[in-house]
Amino acid sequence: IENNIENIVNGVFLTRDLVSEPPNYLNPEKFVTEIKKLTKLGLKVDVFDHLKMKKIGMNALLGVAQGSKNLPYFVTITWKPSNSKNKNPLSFVGKGVCFDTGGISLKPAKFMEDMKYDMAGAGAVVGLMKTLALRKSKSYVIGAVALVENMPGGSAQRPGDIVKSYSGKTIEVLNTDAEGRLILADAIYYIDEQYKPELIVDLATLTGAIVVSLGNEYAGLFSNNDKLSERLIKAGEIENEKLWRFPLHKNYDKLMDSKIADIQNINYSGGAGSITAAQFLQRFLKNKTPWAHLDIAGMAWTKKDLDIIPTGATGFGVKLLNKFVEKFYE
């Protein structure tokens, strides 16, 4: 038991360390360097640079990154034990915006420093993969992180631009600060297409709207699959990383239709921002794969000391997903 707790703590602490780093230190390239250190635990790390992504058409991800001098990366992390219980991998996808100014749709200056935390989804995926490797999980698992910096440079994406995503679908970018869903669109579609996973769970500090809805007590859960949702909620209850499920519906989905592209990246009606963001992501499943989206924007960091968490990054998601894998897939 002690060893198992230590393995979990090591994953959580890695996530906290990554998420708490200042943004001038932890840019996408440095993040990749940190991920590569995990190969000594038996994890396989594959890195796509901007040239590889351009070649295969990850233009939604590349569009977000084009205003920054810090180049983007897409990284897959594989844990495949010889005795794995599952033929098709469980997959976890993390949003890794190492700093988010909002781009040309610039954020207000107040509290912008918190946007160093906008890679907390990716941080959680990396911490999870470390824990799974340390405890020699019996499940075949793929972690994937999309790493970018969203900056308002001279070459930055403009509101009104249209990009052709990896899926082939065109996206009208109405707001460059709705960027997390753009990088996840390419990441989710790639994982679904290439690995045909048993399930996909994505984690992202995706919307401010989820904080309005749930504050700092629950993360938002959105899913196309009841069984997957129930399992995630149960794991969250056990680990005190609580999830609250929101609806998905065709009427919300319609709000993301663009008049000049396949989809637009924001709905300006002003309501249900977290739901419409999830509806956007759902359109980038290639197959009918069980999928869940965790919007962790209210849970990824804390402004005050909590019982066992000091001010800063919380490491939210590592314990939850480790328990989810352990309880239901091993």
Segments predicted by a language model, with ranges:
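Phosphate/ribose-phosphate-bearing ligand recognition and processing surfaces
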Residues: 1-41
